Structures are given as structure tokens and as C-alpha cells.
Curated annotation (Swiss-Prot):
Enzyme Commission numbers on file: 2.7.1.170
Organism: Shewanella halifaxensis (strain HAW-EB4)
Gene name linked to the record: anmK
Protein name per the record: Anhydro-N-acetylmuramic acid kinase
SUPFAM superfamilies from the UniProt entry: Actin-like ATPase domain
Pathway(s) where this gene product acts: Amino-sugar metabolism; 1,6-anhydro-N-acetylmuramate degradation; Cell wall biogenesis; peptidoglycan recycling
Length: 369
């Protein structure tokens, strides 16, 4: 009986569902066995979005949502194993990222907070859970993010190719994998899908801009784009990370107040270009040319991919499918990998990426028994 399975659970800043993956790490490369996405109920999504911003009665709401998300993550796991026909006894551990509700690493006492109670997940699945991956890195002086570059290095690095792995969720991050060297770098570039998702949700009641069609129907306002790109975050040197605390709907609306003459579609186009230009500007500081492999929800946005290719004519811009990994599941597999690293007593962070003082075993262990 194969007993080498790990489950990875991920809900990103876009909050578009809980991604669950079943992975085997016996070979040189991870083998994806099964996948499942558990939708977030509307009421739960609304409460999570509110919790991501300062408000009243936060501790009570936090405690309730921590348990509720734990139950949802457990439900996703059980559905995944049923779909795969795999018994829980065959799973070594679950690697749960949780749901980020605060990420503020640059305070004097920096912190990050993810919810989805791992004790609840362990109790309702009967499987050991490894969670809370980010806070050890912060305790060591790091940003606690991005964590996926260590995984990207493990599975995508090639000594003969200069590669950027671009993950576009609510926030976008890059991993730079230079050929013939171990000098991997990575950081959050800024907004990914988050701002354009929020705008279309607010204006049209749609969860996201499918294929970037609404953005494509508008015209980018260059004055507004330059205003958005003047945000101090874009000028920061790595290591750096960001989140909804900085780039959120309230921030966008504050910026838009100076540009009331624009159509809704023009604003959507401009928000998409903010994502594309901030990514392209950072890519060009890393290298004039190379290969860019895109994963996350943004990989399915045709207009976004088209604009990136125009901004980076000397880059080959494709999705991670060309490297044999479905763009939707890369992050989930990464957290299954981090669970495997923890289980085997191996470090999971890259200090050159996060700014931590040293490598460390990431995550806390929550036994099923």
C-alpha cells in the first residue's frame, strides 16, 4: 500500500475557493494524483473580506471564522480523498496554508496571520496537519512571504535556462531562477487579480473578469496608470511582500476619486495594466530576457497574458503547463511540499527571498490523535 501521499490546502488572497491537491513525492518531481476546489459560501466570503480590514469585534469574528474555515478546509480534504479513492491512512500529512487575514511584516513587531484552525482540520479528517508556515520566517526577521520560491527552485530550476515563475493570485509574486547559479530571488510585485476582481464585483456583480474581456473593452488612462504606479511599494527593494492591507478596494477607490471622468471599463483596463506594468517593470530589473512561466488564476486571463507579452517582447511568456504543471494547482502542490519538508526535518524557506536570518523548518504540527 502506498503511504507517501500528502495533501496541500490553499486559499489565496483572491478568496475564490479552497484548492485541495493530493500529491506523491516519491519521484524526482511531484506527482499530482487528484484535485478538488471547495467554493467559499457567500456569507463566509463576505465575513472574511470584512475581517481583512480593521473593524469592530474583531476577536470574536476571528475566532468564529477560524473554526468555520477549518471545517471548510476539512470538507475540501475529505471530498478530495473520496474523489481519489484514497483512504486517510495513506496520507502522511496535510499541509494547510490557511486563509491570510493580516500580513504586516514591516511593523516594528511584524506579524502575519492565517486562519483555518488546523486542530479542526485534523479532528474532522483524521489526518495529521502541518500549518502556520509563515510565522517562523517572520520570527527570524523575514517577510514570511513569498514561500513558494523554494518549491519553484526545486521543481522548475534548470541550469541551462533563465526563468521567472510568476504566480498571479490576488497578489502577484515572482521567483527568479537564474541559470548556472543558486542565487534565487523572489518577491511580491504588487496587485495581481485582486483589484480588478474587486472592481468587477462592485460594478457588475461578477466574481472576476473572464478572459479579461471587460478590461479589453476599455482603454487605459495613462495619467491614472502612472499615478497608481507611483505608490511607494513599487520602488521598494526586495525582500518585500504585500497583501490586501495595502492594495484593496478602499485604496483603489481613493485613487479613483481623482479620475471620476473615466468609464468603468476604462478603469478596469487601467487596473489590469497596473498589474501588468508592475510585473513587467520588476521582470526587466531581473533580466532583459528569458522565460516567464505563469501560474495562478491570472494564467487563465487571456488579456493579461497578451499585455504581458507586449510589455516583455524578449521574454517567452507561457504558463507552467509547458513545464508539466497545471497553473491552477502549483500553490497547493507547494504547500503539500512544505508539509513533506517539515515531516522530513528539512527547511522550507529561502532567506535570500524572505530576508530571514537563516533557513528553518516551517510550520507547526497538529496530530490527528
Amino acid at each position: 500500500m502506498n503511504n507517501s501521499y500528502y495533501v496541500g490546502l490553499m486559499s489565496g488572497t483572491s478568496m475564490d475557493g479552497v484548492d485541495a491537491v493530493l500529491v506523491n513525492f516519491d519521484g524526482d518531481q511531484p506527482s499530482l494524483i487528484a484535485t478538488h476546489t471547495e467554493a467559499l459560501p457567500k456569507a463566509l466570503l463576505s465575513n472574511l473580506q470584512k475581517l481583512c480590514l480593521p473593524g469592530n469585534d474583531e476577536i470574536n469574528r476571528l475566532g468564529h471564522l477560524d473554526r468555520a474555515m477549518g471545517k471548510l478546509f476539512a470538507k475540501a480534504t475529505n471530498a478530495l480523498l473520496e474523489k481519489a479513492g484514497v483512504d486517510k491512512s495513506q496520507v502522511i500529512a496535510i499541509g494547510s496554508h490557511g486563509q491570510t487575514v493580516r500580513h504586516m511584516p514591516n511593523l516594528e513587531m511584524g506579524f502575519t496571520l492565517q486562519i483555518a484552525d488546523p486542530n479542526t482540520i485534523a479532528a474532522e479528517t483524521g489526518i495529521d496537519v502541518i500549518a502556520d508556515f509563515r510565522r517562523k520566517d517572520i520570527a527570524l526577521g523575514g517577510q514570511g512571504a513569498p514561500l513558494v520560491p523554494a518549491f519553484h527552485q526545486h521543481v522548475f530550476a534548470n541550469p541551462n535556462h533563465q526563468r521567472i515563475i510568476l504566480n498571479i493570485g490576488g497578489i502577484a509574486n515572482v521567483t527568479y531562477l537564474p541559470g548556472n547559479t543558486q542565487d534565487v530571488t523572489g518577491f511580491d510585485t504588487g496587485p495581481g487579480n485582486g483589484l480588478s476582481d474587486a472592481w468587477i464585483q462592485h460594478q457588475l456583480g461578477q466574481p472576476f473578469d473572464k478572459d479579461g474581456a471587460w478590461a479589453a473593452s476599455g482603454t487605459t488612462d495613462q495619467k491614472m496608470l502612472q499615478h497608481l504606479l507611483s505608490h511607494p511599494y513599487f520602488a521598494l527593494a526586495a525582500p518585500k511582500s504585500t497583501g490586501r492591507e495595502l492594495f484593496n478596494q478602499a485604496w483603489a477607490e481613493q485613487q479613483l476619486s481623482e479620475f471620476g471622468h473615466l468609464s468603468e471599463a476604462d478603469i478596469q483596463s487601467t487596473l489590469l495594466d497596473l498589474t501588468c506594468y508592475s510585473i513587467a517593470n520588476d521582470a526587466l530589473t531581473l533580466s532583459d530576457n528569458g522565460e516567464m512561466y505563469v501560474c495562478g488564476g491570472g494564467a487563465y486571463n487571456c488579456e493579461l497574458m497578451h499585455r504581458l507579452r507586449k510589455l516583455l517582447p524578449d521574454y517567452k511568456v507561457v504558463t507552467t503547463s509547458e513545464l508539466g504543471m497545471d497553473p491552477q494547482w502549483v500553490e497547493g502542490i507547494a504547500f503539500a511540499w512544505l508539509a513533506m519538508r517539515h515531516h522530513n526535518g528539512l527547511p522550507g524557506n529561502l532567506p535570500a527571498v524572505t530576508g530571514a536570518s537563516r533557513e528553518a523548518i516551517l510550520g507547526s504540527f497538529h496530530p490527528a490523535d
